[in-house]
From Swiss-Prot:
The keyword Acyltransferase does not apply. PANTHER family: HISTIDINOL-PHOSPHATE AMINOTRANSFERASE (PTHR42885:SF2), HISTIDINOL-PHOSPHATE AMINOTRANSFERASE-RELATED (PTHR42885). The modification N6-(pyridoxal phosphate)lysine is found at residue 214. Homodimer. This is Histidinol-phosphate aminotransferase. One of its GO terms (molecular function) is histidinol-phosphate transaminase activity. The keyword Amino-acid biosynthesis applies. Pathway: Amino-acid biosynthesis; L-histidine biosynthesis; L-histidine from 5-phospho-alpha-D-ribose 1-diphosphate: step 7/9. One of its GO terms (biological process) is L-histidine biosynthetic process. Keywords: Amino-acid biosynthesis, Aminotransferase, Histidine biosynthesis, Pyridoxal phosphate, Transferase. NCBIfam families: hisC (TIGR01141). It catalyses: L-histidinol phosphate + 2-oxoglutarate = 3-(imidazol-4-yl)-2-oxopropyl phosphate + L-glutamate.
Length: 356
């Protein structure tokens, strides 16, 4: 009887899988971390719940109610999970049959849609965006057969722009009765007028992903939300873990979503937008920067001369950016998280010193 290695025992799709390269996984030794779109400083919270001997609620009532009120939806339309990343995976697990169904997404965009599908053994189809990074609706229409979930990130990571709302409507009409459309609104707090939350009544197949990692400054909490109609939420509840949120996470999330927590978040957003405009203006004057793209988020995408050399030079100086060269249509591009004024100045000074 022949023996097999542990790796041989693993599923073939897992053996072939390239894991998502998160900012932390990519490493680096820096003082200026501008590669993960985090808020630059920590927000303090005190735990109020000490019942750590008991299992938590699956869907903590106060968290759900606070988020529903904030988002302008009913509590029955909210699911809380371990980051929006878990929401991405739950939607695939609930709606896609491995080896039969597919998801569709439009690169350049967030990398977890493909990783989540590939892990489960669900086909990934891609329709690259147009030159202006808007949706190729004809291309999507041509590839929809067999697709159960379509992911659209708006504002899009890493490009920073909003998807045209009329294109969203067209996509929702194309997919009606065929597939779930997922609007990933991880960065919507920086442009709240563009949220699709008000469209849920009109489109039963729309789902929206949200997070506390960006504007709420709680990336370390791992707390995200899916907004959808009750029928979708009930299906997701069948596949979510029994205790997705620990008691301390639920405690802090509820505080962050209190009226005063929302006010504080909006103050942070205003500060980041001011800093973003300062950094954009400065980048446009730097010789090694070829192009700075408009942003509706807390990060800036820019195209550089000799971007790999620039990236490494700043890395060696302890300034960690995110290289986007491998993404479709993003040759020469680096993504810069908007940090503090001091961090912005470090980036500006380092880039001005580049001889390329």
């Amino acid at each position: 009887m022949s023996t097999v290695t542990i790796t041989d025992l693993a599923r073939e799709n897992v053996r072939n899988l390239t894991p998502y390269q998160s900012a932390r996984r990519l490493g680096g030794n820096g003082d200026v971390w501008l590669n993960a779109n985090e808020y630059p400083t920590a927000v303090e919270f005190q735990l109020t719940q000490q019942t750590l001997n008991r299992y938590p609620e699956c869907q903590p009532k106060v968290v759900i109610e606070n988020y529903a009120q904030y988002a302008g939806v009913k509590p029955e339309q909210v699911l809380v999970s371990r980051g929006a990343d878990e929401g991405i995976e739950l939607l695939i697990r609930a709606f896609c049959e491995p080896g039969k169904d597919a998801i569709l997404y439009c690169p350049p965009t967030y990398g977890m849609y493909s990783v989540s599908a590939e892990t489960i053994g669900v086909e990934c189809r891609t329709v690259p965006t147009l030159d202006n990074w808007q949706l190729d609706l004809q291309g999507i229409s041509d590839k929809l057969d067999g697709v159960k979930v379509v992911y659209v990130c708006s504002p899009n990571n890493p490009t920073g722009q909003l998807i045209n709302p009329q294109d969203f409507r067209t996509l929702l009409e194309l997919t009606r009765g065929k597939a779930i459309v997922v609007a990933d609104e991880a960065y919507i707090e920086f442009c709240p007028q563009a949220s699709l939350a008000g469209w849920l009544a009109e489109y039963p197949h729309l789902a929206i992903l949200r997070t506390l990692s960006k504007a709420f400054a709680l990336a370390g909490l791992r707390c995200g939300f899916t907004l959808a109609n009750e029928e979708v939420i009930n299906l997701l509840m069948k596949v979510i873990a029994p205790y997705p949120l620990s008691t301390p996470v639920a405690d802090i999330a509820a505080q962050a979503l209190s009226p005063q927590g929302i006010v504080a978040m909006r103050e942070r957003v205003a500060q980041i937008i001011t800093e973003r405009e300062y950094l954009i203006a400065a980048l446009k004057e730097i010789p090694c920067v070829e192009q700075v793209f408009d942003s509706e988020t807390n990060y800036i995408l820019a195209r550089f001369k000799a971007s790999s050399a620039v990236f490494k030079s700043l890395w060696d100086q302890g300034i960690i950016l995110r290289d986007q060269n491998k993404q479709p249509s993003l040759s020469g591009c680096l993504r810069i998280t908007v940090g503090t004024r001091e961090e912005s100045q470090c980036v500006i000074d380092a880039l001005r010193a580049e001889q390329v």
